[in-house]
């Protein structure tokens, strides 16, 4: 919902995308309609319409994507680092382009960041069960799409930690809306806040991870190694629905490369659920106890990839 007494806060919102402009525009609509807006929104993106970007009452800084690879692949970690380097504020909130922010997300997460300035804080996602209609996207841009509608259209991911719905209304009792955790594997870079000093201390996202998988877990493991506290919060975002593959065999190559990179660095296997599924499909030979690099045994056929495609799934 739009707010008459909207605040502007000294925080930079950073997002990056390619080929997902409908989601990007919805994200910008939600930011513009929130109770408080960031003083700048940094978009690492090459293909969005500058005239459309100019239509939002936000200070938007668009910077071009760059890739660490020579083949021009979209490297989300590298692009997040570019966004952080371009940020004018010390406080930074990173959002996947799939996000819509709740009315008070920016205001509440920023306030919590100011009270925990040396920590890593992550928000709470809900998952839309279908894409927004054109009418709903228009209402969102007009500040007329109620959060009750987004709550009705969304669900929680039962495989991740979730706050109860009651906790969303208990911002005044902060003990119920923020939890210090040692489970750094629960970190997901969909929606998180961090100050520049801690981001630099971590080293940003490791750009040795190419393509899909493990770069956010690596980021969290480095935070843990450095003693940076990690908080889960009930600050709410809505993940816009898009098709997925179950299992993610369309990303087999990059998942294996990144899993090997992660194990070499941390002596721990990330993405064990996916690796287990790949092993059951005889695509790889892998067990949680192994210490040797994973090798691809079989490549999925196009028919296999199409069979794994789930166009209506809310999450992987």
What label would you give each PLM region?
Residues 104-150:
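Conserved donor NDP-sugar-binding/catalytic core segment of glycosyltransferases
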Residues 231-249, 262:
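Active-site donor/metal-binding and catalytic loop motifs
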Residues 1-30:
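N-proximal low-complexity "stem/linker" segments adjacent to membrane-targeting elements
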Residues 69-87:
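Glycine-rich, basic loop-to-helix element that forms the pyrophosphate-binding segment
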Residues 92:
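Short aromatic/hydrophobic "clamp" motif used to bind/position activated sugar donors
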Residues 29-38:
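Short, acidic, metal-binding catalytic loop of nucleotide-sugar glycosyltransferases
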Residues 142-184:
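Short, flexible, basic/aromatic active-site loop/helix in glycosyltransferases
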Residues 200, 207-210, 220-238:
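Catalytic donor-sugar/metal-binding loop of nucleotide-sugar-dependent glycosyltransferases
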